[in-house]
Swiss-Prot record:
Homodimer. Interacts with SufS. This is Cysteine desulfuration protein SufE. The keyword Cytoplasm applies. One of its GO terms (biological process) is sulfur compound metabolic process. The gene is sufE.
Length: 138
C-alpha cells in the first residue's frame, strides 16, 4: 500500500488540515490514491451491507500471513473512508485486525463527530465486515 501514508503520517496530515473542508478533501484524495478494484471483485460476496453507498471490500492473506485489503465505493468520500480504514489495518495479520481498536485513532482525528449519521453507520459496517472476515481467517 505504498500509495497511502502510514498511520502516523495519516494522523499528522489530518491534524494539519485547517478546517473540515480541507479534511474532507484530504479523505477524498486518499480514496483517489487507492488502486482500482477489478470489476470481478465487485461481487455480492465482497459487498458491505449497512452502507448507503455501494461498498466492496476484498481481503486476501499473503504467504506471510499478512492481510491485504482492496476496496472501492461509488461515492468519493466513502472511498476515502475506506482508504483511512485500510491504512489503520495495514500490515496486520487476521488476529491483529480482530484485536485492534480503531476508535482511538478516529477520536484523535475527530473523524466520527464530523460525519453524517449514515456515513458513521457505513464506517462501522465496513469495520464490522473487515473484522468478521479477519476472524474467519484467524
Amino acid at each position: 500500500m505504498a500509495v497511502l501514508p502510514d498511520k502516523e503520517k495519516l494522523l499528522r496530515n489530518f491534524l494539519r488540515c485547517a478546517n473540515w473542508e480541507e479534511k474532507y478533501l484530504y479523505i477524498i484524495e486518499l480514496g483517489q490514491r487507492m488502486p482500482e478494484l477489478h470489476d470481478e471483485d465487485k461481487s455480492p460476496q465482497n459487498s458491505v451491507q449497512g452502507c448507503q453507498s455501494q461498498v466492496w471490500i476484498v481481503m486476501r492473506q499473503n504467504a506471510q500471513g499478512i492481510i491485504e485489503l482492496q476496496g472501492d465505493s461509488d461515492a468519493a468520500i466513502v472511498k476515502g473512508l475506506i482508504a483511512v480504514v485500510f491504512i489503520l489495518y495495514d500490515q496486520m495479520t487476521p488476529q491483529d485486525i480482530v484485536n485492534f481498536d480503531v476508535r482511538p485513532w478516529f477520536e484523535k482525528m475527530a473523524l466520527t463527530q464530523h460525519l453524517t449519521p449514515s456515513r458513521s453507520q457505513g464506517l462501522e459496517a465496513m469495520i464490522r465486515a473487515i473484522r468478521a472476515k479477519a476472524a474467519a481467517l484467524s
